[in-house]
From Swiss-Prot:
Name of the protein in question: Uncharacterized protein in grm 3'region
Region (Disordered): 80-105
Superkingdom in the source lineage: Bacteria
Length: 105
């Protein structure tokens, strides 16, 4: 699945669609990495205890990603739809639905 998502994300970036991909990440990876222009990958998860589960891998992994994603998104887009931080990769015209989703050539 990750290979398919990477291929789709790269194709969309090359077509001019700016994207911020939120992932669980792994220890030792940089918190943010720009793969190519228009495609940024950011780790979004909360710390969680290392309690193993035979069914899901780690207890609470999905919930840690959900909380991290909500925290990341709320930090990037204010109630007005505009970015609240210079680290956000979303443009305000995309967040509000106004303007083009194409990057200028």
């Amino acid at each position: 699945m990750q290979v398919q998502i990477l291929a789709l994300s790269r194709s969309l970036a090359r077509a001019g669609v700016d994207q911020l991909v939120l992932t669980l990440g792994f220890p030792g990876l940089p918190p943010t990495k720009q793969i190519e222009p228009g495609l940024t990958v950011r780790i979004a998860r909360m710390s969680l205890p290392q309690i193993r589960s035979e069914i899901t891998g780690l207890v609470g992994l999905g919930q840690a990603w959900l909380i991290g994603t909500i925290r990341e998104w709320s930090g990037c887009v204010a109630a007005t739809g505009g970015p609240t931080s210079s680290t956000c990769t979303r443009r305000s015209d995309l967040a509000t639905g106004r303007g083009s989703d194409r990057r200028p050539d």
